Amino acid sequence: MMHENPIKRRPSRRLYVGNVPIGDGAPIAVQSMTNTETTDVDATVAQIEALAQAGADIVRVSVPTMEAAEAFKQIKQRSPVPLVTDIHFDYRIALKVAEYGADCLRINPGNIGHEDRIKAVVDAARERNIPIRIGVNGGSLEKDLQEKYGEPTAEALVESAMRHVNILYKLDFYDFKVSVKASDVFLAVESYRLLAQKIDQPLHLGITEAGGKRSGAVKSSVGLGMLLAEGIGDTLRVSLAADPVEEIKVGFDILKSLRIRARGINFIACPSCSRQEFDVINTVNALEERLEDITIPMDVSIIGCVVNGPGEALVSHVGLAGAKNKSGLYIGGARQKLRLDNQNLVDELEAQIREQVKFIEANKIDVKEING
């Protein structure tokens, strides 16, 4: 059912974004970012609530103007999860949102300004126990680094990050995390690997501007998966040109696939072939949609025939092995006398899964949620 993963997490410092622990073995936090106009308070709060419902631990909000900062004050008061404020160009906005209760300040070294401005932000953060995220991006490196390296390289991204890491160290401020994002998978991966060797701050992972719902999910899964499998990463965001809720779903799917952190059902399903005794694809799609509300981690196998069906079912919390007219049901790896009608599989299997969820909750059974 949920096998241990062999990943050894990279040691890192502990900090807190609101009440969410980051680093030092804490569960890898999944976050997204709103794409509403921040000045539209109701729309932004509604999106934050939808993200929280999907499982977001943290939500980032862009605050590009002082008007947006004033709106953030109201948003923060209504948010069900900690909020990171995304600040570019004007350090004074960071000072204002710190005053209004931001849970983390994200600044970009490439455009926030001189060291004295960074010091002002650090002083505000220190006074209110707010962590900072140094966010380096391959598309917005400092001009001198662009000239030095000619193009974004891992060395350039890490040099940019280390400049500002060292400024914070010099200011005796250690409550920060770092990201070195790029849209190219290999560039991002190499940048994070290099940075991980230099500092013990928590690392926020991401492949920036990854793409649309499908291509972005694939690119992020490959890049973040490589790093996570090496034990690198303490929080992540999957960047998609799509509904931000999809970012949370993909983020948890990545962690679930690596057995790092489980949330909801892990469906194990065959791609189907002429041996299938029922419509596997439509059955799985329907159940994924119907069972999105379940947060308990479970393995559910849905296999269309008896070649691999029984074997997968033996290591699943709930399993279905296709057979003619009625398919075999397995609970906790044990075959049941009850067989499910192939003509009504979605309803019957959903009922069985929900019964198992109730049983687990009522008996407080440990379903082995692995938090790495």
Swiss-Prot record:
The keyword Oxidoreductase applies. Its cofactor is [4Fe-4S] cluster. It catalyses: (2E)-4-hydroxy-3-methylbut-2-enyl diphosphate + oxidized [flavodoxin] + H2O + 2 H(+) = 2-C-methyl-D-erythritol 2,4-cyclic diphosphate + reduced [flavodoxin]. [4Fe-4S] cluster binds at C270, C273, C305, E312. Binds 1 [4Fe-4S] cluster. Pathway: Isoprenoid biosynthesis; isopentenyl diphosphate biosynthesis via DXP pathway; isopentenyl diphosphate from 1-deoxy-D-xylulose 5-phosphate: step 5/6. Its EC number is 1.17.7.3. Converts 2C-methyl-D-erythritol 2,4-cyclodiphosphate (ME-2,4cPP) into 1-hydroxy-2-methyl-2-(E)-butenyl 4-diphosphate. GO terms for biological process: isopentenyl diphosphate biosynthetic process, methylerythritol 4-phosphate pathway; terpenoid biosynthetic process. InterPro entries: Dihydropteroate_synth-like_sf, IspG_bac, IspG_bac-typ, NO2/SO3_Rdtase_4Fe4S_sf. Keywords: 4Fe-4S, Iron, Iron-sulfur, Isoprene biosynthesis, Metal-binding, Oxidoreductase. SUPFAM superfamilies: Dihydropteroate synthetase-like (SSF51717), Nitrite and sulphite reductase 4Fe-4S domain-like (SSF56014). One of its GO terms (molecular function) is 4-hydroxy-3-methylbut-2-en-1-yl diphosphate synthase activity (ferredoxin). This is 4-hydroxy-3-methylbut-2-en-1-yl diphosphate synthase (flavodoxin). Belongs to the IspG family.
